[in-house]
Amino acid sequence: MPKTTTRTPGRLSGKFWKLLGAATEKNQGRSLAQVKASADYETKAADLDDEQLRKAAELLRLEDLSESADIPQFLAIAREAAERSTSLRPFDVQLLGALRMLAGDVVEMATGEGKTLSGAIAAAGYALGGRSVHVITINDYLARRDAEWMGPLIEALGLTVGWITAESTAEERRRAYTCDVTYASVNEIGFDVLRDQLVTDVADLVSPNPDVALIDEADSVLVDEALVPLVLAGTSHRETPRVELIRMVGELTPGRDFDTDTDSRNVHLTDEGARKLEAKLGGIDLYSEEHVGTTLTEVNVALHAHVLLQRDVHYIVRDDAVHLINSSRGRIAQLQRWPDGLQAAVEAKEGIATTETGEVLDTITVQALINRYPTVCGMTGTALAAGEQLRQFYKLGVSPIEPNKPNIREDESDRVYVTAAAKIDAIIEHIEEVHKTGQPVLVGTHDVAESEELHEKLVKRGVPAVVLNAKNDAEEARVIAEAGKLGAVTVSTQMAGRGTDIRLGGSDEGDHDEVAELGGLHVVGTGRHNTQRLDNQLRGRAGRQGDPGSSVFFSSWEDELVQAHLEPNKRPMQADENGRVLTDKAAALLDHAQRVAEGRLLDVHANTWRYNQLTAQQRAIIVERRDALLRTPTAREELAELSPKRYAELAEELSEERLERICRLIMLYHLDRGWCEHLAYLADIRESIHLRALGRQNPLDEFHRMAVDAFASLAADAIEAAQQTFETAPSFEDEPGVDLSKLARPTSTWTYMVHDNPLADDTMAALSLPGVFR
């Protein structure tokens, strides 16, 4: 069987460096020279006591990192501080990774190479230069773990460190944000930004001005979740979704009443299906002007829920609730939900009471959240494969960091089968064969259903496998930590962001030498993913820090990737008696299908970004306006100009401070109310905008036109409403002042993430936002 051994690449060409987006090979070479120069200061650093080391760090001049002559001294001090405080002595490659992050790059460091320590050193470097650093993780567990783990190093350099999780109170969050380095998950930072858009007093603000974002698992945050909207919702009296309509749609017959496209991304009613529903709904016309943007939209959403979203693939049902599965991580997507109509449709499909959604008070995508930071850098094990997206959407370069020890993992070429059944049989036999030797096996599957099917078959064959998926992800740290033990067989969904290294011999490395002698960890993939990056994340679990390891992927012509992205006439069907495809070109054909899938994913990202970009620009204008109302006398000055008579009356009764507060509350209320209604309008447009194509209109152009028109009137309407309230709000009978009780804000708010449905369109319309508040 053909194998390839993954080894450290040699010197990269200058052309390749430019393609990566890193400044130049010369800059990487300069960083390497600075790492080597740091050796000259190591003895001096070692001779300092802890207090002297801290003072030496404080004396460093790191304000201008690109020109600072103190970089070598900083590296020597950081290395010494790390060894004293964490018992970890950074390798040269870890210092190099830190320097490239200090240069504003995303670094690619293989699994097990010490990204966490490298990131902490980079964060300390920025902080010593006077910058405020947010180390952004993909979940609360990693935020707290890394802050507590790396905190002693950061504090040894005279800096402060804090962390934030979902349980943190407002006061704890404020304290954490005042630290030099703050660890927090991307969603918690986003939710703090959103909640700050409801405060009516500067003292209630929590989130500081963004400065430096250092992102762990950067490709996961910046690419996989870039377009995930974070949402702040409040109580409202919205209509309950029509459960009966959702059930009617569930009774439709596939092929006769509705059809799906070839890659099962879209579903639509047939004429017969439309007639059947129209009859059940009392003889209405679904395509009439009255129903096309309401009832027909509900029908399409219900179809999506019933046909395209599969239980144990896209979501699981646990504790009488629907939990979304993060497709790139294979675990429950905490706090995430689909757009309101789709969430309710899935809940109705599963016979679960629909959950309260409220109204959206504010929203921001992860991409827009990160783009607020003047400086962005990060680290991941698979940055190169995401290089194009990082350049296109964030203008970030990628710096690959060579491993401390050469990677000697052996990657076997794909084993390809004609049918999925033959592939599964071959996987079971292969795992059983490897398990008999005692070599630990890690099996990476695509979804919960596949992991459970494989686990069940292995157990029936006497293989003592353990399974890790979205249903038991609370046990992941323990399961993954022991996946390298002698004889272990672990079946897991996606491995991205698991945050725990697999050490040969188990967590205590007791059987390390014996497992290494057997060939190290053996990784089995049950099929290619839509992106090579996810394949590499799975493979990268083997061959950690120069350990031996191996990997092999099993695929079939019936796999989803092949069905959607490789034409049937390009799939060779000649196979052996076990159903394995004989041609040597099979792996190349899979590569082709994967490239097509990656291209489509990039298109989807770009097209969805085009819809979100306008909302992000409009939100930025609202934020600027709100900040002015909150921090300056703008509200009082504008209302004094608009309603001079009423202002003069109140000025005689009230102190300037109290009058200013009343004006601010009125202006903020109507601005927030207008933005909330504008977001609801945009959501309604997006749910039905694809129907514009039926009238030969470009959906994106129409969305932009309607959104810009509505936003232009938002400003005037908010100011007019504020003026009316200011003039008509009754005065209190017993004391000076104005009764603002009718300006009721939501009695409760909550946050969640929306697992959005991308809108595909190839045209980017030119945007121009009016200076609506100017």
Swiss-Prot record:
GO terms for biological process: intracellular protein transmembrane transport; protein import; protein targeting; protein transport by the Sec complex. It is found in: Cell membrane; Cytoplasm. GO terms for cellular component: cell envelope Sec protein transport complex; cytosol; plasma membrane. It catalyses: ATP + H2O + cellular proteinSide 1 = ADP + phosphate + cellular proteinSide 2. Keywords: ATP-binding, Cell membrane, Cytoplasm, Membrane, Nucleotide-binding, Protein transport, Translocase, Translocation, Transport. Its EC number is 7.4.2.8. ATP binds at residues 94, 112-116, 501. It holds the Pfam family SecA_PP_bind. Monomer and homodimer. Part of the essential Sec protein translocation apparatus which comprises SecA, SecYEG and auxiliary proteins SecDF. Other proteins may also be involved. HAMAP family: SecA. PANTHER family: CHLOROPLAST PROTEIN-TRANSPORTING ATPASE, SECA INNER MEMBRANE COMPONENT OF SEC PROTEIN SECRETION SYSTEM. NCBIfam families: SecA2_Mycobac. This is Protein translocase subunit SecA 2.
